[in-house]
Every structure is written in C-alpha cells, then in structure tokens.
Design a protein with these regions (language model features):
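Carbohydrate-binding/catalytic loop surfaces
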Residues: 1-5, 51-93, 140-161, 192, ...
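Aromatic- and histidine-enriched alpha-helix N-cap/loop-to-helix transition segments
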Residues: 1-12, 29-32, 91-102, 149-153, ...
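Well-ordered alpha-helical scaffold segments within catalytic/enzyme domains
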Residues: 10-26, 98-116, 156-167, 196-205, ...
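Active-site acid/base region of carbohydrate-active enzymes
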Residues: 20-99, 113-156, 167, 216, ...
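Non-catalytic C-terminal accessory modules of carbohydrate-active enzymes
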Residues: 122-123, 208-354
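Solenoid-like repeat scaffolds
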Residues: 146-148, 178-186, 216-223
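Alpha-helical repeat scaffolds
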Residues: 169-177, 247
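A glycine- and small/hydrophobic-rich beta-loop-beta segment
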Residues: 172-175, 203, 213
Length: 354
C-alpha cells in the first residue's frame, strides 16, 4: 500500500539512522527494498490516481491537521457525501511528488555513502522537481490548485524540496508568513506538515516564526497541551482540555510521537547541536544556535556516536554567553547568532561572550 508519507519511512528511516550514527549497515540491509520501492514510485510518479487500485481513493496525508482537505475530519469530501473532492486528489498527488523528490535525494546520498553510483537518483530527484513545477506550481510561486494557496503544508513541502527559487520562493515565503499571521501565529499542520515545519522555517529565514509557534499557547500548539496537563505528546492538538475534557474519543492517543518532532528543532536550532549531513555520525558537528530571550537559557548534552556534545547558553544583562564542548576526535563548524560566517573548532571546551 502506497500511503504517502508513511510508505516513505522505508527510505527516510535508513537515511536518518545512518546520518545520526554513521553506520551504513542499515542502508546496505535495506538497499534492495528501497530500490524496488523507488522504481515503483518512478514508474507511477507516485500519482494518486495511478495508484488508486493499491490505496483505494483515500490517503492519510497531513493527518489530523486543521487545514482544508484533511482526511480524518472528512474535509477531503464533498460536504454531506462520500465523494472525494478533486482538489484533495490533486493535493495527495502533489504531496506524493514532494516525497518522491525527497526520497530520491536521500537515495542518491545513500548510494554515494555505500560506494554506488548516485546518478540514477540524482536524475530522478531532478525529474521529480521538474514534475512538481510542471503539474502543481505556477512560475510566480502560487499553486495551480487554488485551495493550496490558503494552506501551510503545501508551501512547506515546496520549500523543503527546493522546488521554488528566486522571486517565486520569496512570494511563497511571504504568503506563508501571512498565513501564520492570519491564524494568530498558530500552526495548522498535521503529521506530515509538522514533521518538516520548524526546520523548513529556520532554513528559509523564518526562525522568528518558528519561535512564535514554539511559544504559542492557543490551540493548536505544543504548549496548549502542556497547559492542559499533558506530560506526553498527544495524537491530536486538542486531545483534551480542562474546559471541555476529553476530545474526540475515537482514535485519540495521549502517547503519540508525531508532533514530538519539535524536539529535533529544539536540539538542532535552539541548542545548536546538529550533525553535518556530509559526515554522518557527528564526526563533524554543525553548531549554529538561534537563541531567544523568551527561552531564557539552554543547557543541552547529547551523547552522540562521536562522543558527548555540550551546548549551554544564557543571557546576563546585555551579554549572551555560550559554552560548548566538541568531543575528542570530532570537529565543529560554529556560527554565532546573527552571523553568516562559520569558524572551525577542534575538540575541546569553549566559552563565547557576545
């Protein structure tokens, strides 16, 4: 079954584990299965209509999000019927194409990592991007399916896979920022959109908005659940509230990791501890913290495959003080807040006052 986003775990998980721990065994063990999957994706262009016999006319897609066309809440249907909206079918095919591009990029990277020729997948990634621009995105950065222009997740995926550039990208970013503002600086994303939300915003110069979302307390937000007693990550943004009690009782898990992906952003961006994709296993570390006074301080330690990495920052008056440790045998590219140039640090402990 080709459930977009879920089926892609067969490619995304091996790539992620390899990058995190530096061991190619998981890539080698799964290469044949990943290659077969990608051949099927390529043959069908991951198109929902083409794959309808496998999937039925349904996708989980951006599950339990608040946007139009969401499947669980039946926004993908013509109101009062079981007829799937053509806009929803088009949306599913667009998201699938974005995963096709993402998967192909990861496959090329993994091929190179295990000594294989990456050209097949480099070419496939280029074809997927060309397909996205031909079928789904106008030259000005708007979506051909007009309802997607009112949503957050479609723009996030276009930015994630670098399908838009130049003025088209700038226009999409401006529209995305306006969308957040129109929703009171609240996210509207579900499982898939949230998985790339914070990192994509930061990579595209919108870390300020990422922090707005992190500190948001209205529904939907991470702190809404915390304010309502959560000690775990919930499946739904509004799974419970003190005012209304338990939300929808069907399929309402209170221990469901999907939205826990924000922790990756906290470690990589707030704390500034990220693996360099070019050197798996934290042998080279990207340390680029993005502080915010509302957070107050960060004290983080990560026992990586390369050793213990530390990052702790705090404010003292007008000064920002950062202490960090690069483990023995590793190196780090360090970029200070507000700067673009990085500096190479060898193993050791350091303090910077800015």
């Amino acid at each position: 079954m080709m459930r977009l986003g879920w089926a892609d775990a067969g490619v995304i998980v091996p790539w992620t584990v390899w990058k995190q721990f530096g061991d190619t065994k998981i890539v080698k063990d799964n290469w044949e299965a990943m290659n077969r999957f990608m051949n099927h994706v390529y043959e069908t262009k991951y198109d929902h209509k083409t794959l309808i016999k496998e999937n039925g006319n349904y996708q989980w897609a951006d599950w339990v999000g608040y946007e139009p066309l969401e499947s669980y809440y039946r926004r993908h249907l013509v109101p009062g019927t079981k007829v799937v909206l053509p806009e929803a079918v088009d949306y599913w095919s667009y998201l699938s194409a974005a995963y096709w591009a993402l998967d192909a990029t990861y496959m090329a990277d993994m091929a190179k990592g295990i000594g294989l020729d990456p050209s097949k997948y480099n070419k496939m990634a280029d074809e997927a991007i060309a397909y996205i621009n031909e079928k789904f995105i106008n030259a000005d950065g708007t979506f051909k399916n007009q309802i997607l222009n009112t949503m957050q997740t479609p723009a996030l995926f276009a930015l994630k896979v670098k399908a838009v550039k130049g003025d088209a990208k700038d226009a999409m970013l401006a529209r995305l920022r306006k969308n957040f503002e129109e929703h009171g600086n609240c996210l509207q994303t579900g499982f898939l959109g949230t998985s790339i939300l914070m990192g994509t915003l930061t990579e595209n110069g919108m870390s300020d908005m990422a922090y707005e979302l992190l500190f948001q307390r209205k529904n939907p937000s991470w702190l809404f659940s915390v304010d309502n007693g959560a000690t775990t990550i919930w499946e739904r943004w509004d799974g419970y509230s003190k005012e209304h009690g338990v939300g929808i009782r069907r399929m309402n898990s209170y221990n469901h990791y999907a939205y826990g992906c924000v922790c990756e952003w906290i470690w990589e961006t707030a704390a500034g501890i990220a693996s360099d994709p070019a050197t798996p296993g934290f042998k080279h570390i990207i340390m680029k913290p993005v502080p915010d006074k509302r957070l107050g301080f960060v004290k983080a330690e990560y026992n990586s495959a390369a050793g213990l990495i530390k990052s702790a920052w705090r404010y003292e008056g007008d000064n920002w003080i950062w202490e960090f440790t690069v483990p023995e045998g590793a190196t780090a590219s360090v970029t200070l807040p507000g700067e673009s140039e990085s500096k190479l640090y060898k193993s050791g402990s350091y303090q910077i006052v800015k």
